[in-house]
């Protein structure tokens, strides 16, 4: 009987470890997809800026991502950049002042013009930066709740 209890205890311990590890692996997979999409969007913004003599794209207010693509420069009709994204990106905006927060929902992506990432890469700063600077903020999934992540342009 004691041997059976020991085997059951070990099996239970293994099951607990597996049940704790699987959600973390799924979260990491979703965050990796978001990070890849965010970097692709930043590349698209960089290409747009290069093709338009350093001009940052016009503001886009919380556009829903449709057809698996984000259009940068959508209001100009000229020199647009289309970036393919997957379903992890839920909405996209280009703004002058940050409005995205952790309550915006996982997958929200925002390019903030005239800004750069703070030292911890969790928010943007707008003082003392070039008028051609831009940063991208996106909401990712953390172990204790949603978190903001930042990528400098």
Place the predicted regions along the sequence by residue.
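Short, surface-exposed interaction loops/tails
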Residues: 118-153
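N-terminal single-pass transmembrane signal-anchor helix
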Residues: 1-22
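Membrane-proximal amphipathic alpha-helices
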Residues: 26-38
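Alpha-helix exit/C-cap motif
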Residues: 43-63
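Acidic, glycine-rich loop-and-strand cores that form catalytic or ligand-binding grooves
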Residues: 59-116
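Localized chelating/binding microdomains
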Residues: 7, 35-38, 42
